[in-house]
Structures are given as C-alpha cells and as structure tokens.
Curated annotation (Swiss-Prot):
It comes from Arabidopsis thaliana. One of its GO terms (molecular function) is transcription corepressor activity. GO terms for biological process: cellular heat acclimation; response to heat; seed development. The keyword Cell membrane does not apply. Signal peptide: none annotated. This is Heat shock factor-binding protein. InterPro entries: HS1-bd.
C-alpha cells in the first residue's frame, strides 16, 4: 500500500508541476502580447506627436513667427531667471 501511495504522490506532484509550468507559459505569452501592444501604441503616439509638432511648425512658418519662441507655459514649469528678464 505504501508503494501505491508513493506513486499517487509522485503523479500528483508531476501533475501539479505540469499545471504550474503550463500556467506560467500562458502568463508569459499574455504578458508578451500586452507588452508588444503597449510598445506599438507608444510608437504610434510618438509618431502622432511628431506629426503635430510638424503641423505646428508649418502653421507658425505660414504666420511668419518661426523665429519667436513658443509662449511660456502658465503652470510655472519654466521659472524665469534674473538674467533672462533684463
């Protein structure tokens, strides 16, 4: 009877190991798919940003203001230094 219990334990351990390996493989595949999707979306957003920047520059050139800096942000992200205000 001990030999039979030992075989059941070994089979149960093998089944659990196979289950966990399969689960980890599925998780890896899903993670890779999501990662690829995120990278693709980030690349697309980067392309759109570049297109928007080019459109803005084209519009500014048409308006004749190409040499002027863009308006300062109102959020205070760019603090003014005394040297730049004189």
């Amino acid at each position: 009877m001990d030999g039979h219990d030992s075989e059941d334990t070994k089979q149960s351990t093998a089944d659990m190991t196979a289950f966990v390996q399969n689960l980890l493989q599925q998780m890896q595949t899903r993670f890779q798919t999501m990662s690829d999707s995120i990278i693709t979306k980030i690349d697309d957003m980067g392309g759109r940003i570049n297109e928007l920047e080019q459109s803005i520059n084209d519009l500014r050139a048409e308006m004749g203001v190409e040499g002027t800096p863009p308006p300062a942000s109102k959020s205070g992200d760019e603090p003014k230094t005394p040297a730049s205000s004189s």
